[in-house]
Amino acid sequence: MKHLVADDVARASALAASHIADLSRDAIDARGMFSVALAGAPELEPVYRALRARKDVDWKRWEVFFAEERAVSTEDPDSAFGFVSQHLLAKVPIREAKVRPMFSLGTDVAAAAVDYIDPMVSLLGDPPVFDLVLFTVGRNAEVLGLHPLCPALSSVSPVEAVADAPIPPEGDRVTLTPLVLRAARALMLVAFGPRHARALRMVLEDGDDRLRVPGQAIRDAQGEVFLVVDDALAKALDLR
């Protein structure tokens, strides 16, 4: 695991954006595209802001999927698609056909999960291998749409529906699974502020308990893992 630490949120976000730009360039050089799964969370807004300001990203080569989604309209404030579109996708020249929403209002979440698998596997293989999965962590070490004791944690499918997820905002979700985290070429976990110290200690330091600590799925990663934190959180975790 590589720790990306900077003095404050803005600098840490800029550092994350720089590494994403590097990963994008390397993937495009190697495979002609950059495949990424993005999460919609306020914690990621400064990262998206820093990323969209960069001039060295070949946006037209990006293939965008989502790491998780709530069963809401894309106009709903809780929509991951809406959040990422507002803070990144609508502000950069990514082709609409290259952006794949995870859920459409009126669709059953179980059907949405099944429907999301085919385009992902067709483009990225089985299991799908993303160049990057970008996400954050919840207060109980939740990642993506995966909460403690969630059945999807042991799924052999890359995408699952989660009914009545207790992760705020509560409700049905569609999510990638640990299978995808394990196979990805790179994972980037972003967290700012000492309030995340407890959750990250559970992820990084506690004994293995993947079903009760979903974030521990990153321990099985076959690719690179980047932990992006600000100085306040780094000190709380004794990383500085």
What is each PLM-predicted segment?
Residues 132-179:
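Class I SAM-dependent methyltransferase SAM-binding "motif I" and its flanking Rossmann-like core
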Residues 1-36:
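N-terminal glycine-/serine-/threonine-rich phosphate-binding loop
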Residues 49-59, 82, 86, 148-157, ...:
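A glycine- and small-aliphatic-rich helix-loop capping segment at beta-alpha/alpha-beta transitions
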Residues 111-113, 143-149, 199-203, 239:
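A short secondary-structure junction signal
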Residues 28-53:
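Glycine-rich N-terminal segment of FAD-binding domains in flavoprotein oxidoreductases
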Residues 38-43, 135-139, 192:
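Glycine-rich beta-strand-to-loop/alpha-helix junction loops that act as flexible
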Residues 59-134:
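Ligand-binding beta-strand-loop-alpha-helix segment within the catalytic cores
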Residues 185-240:
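ATP/nucleoside-binding phosphotransfer catalytic cores, i.e., glycine-rich phosphate-binding loops
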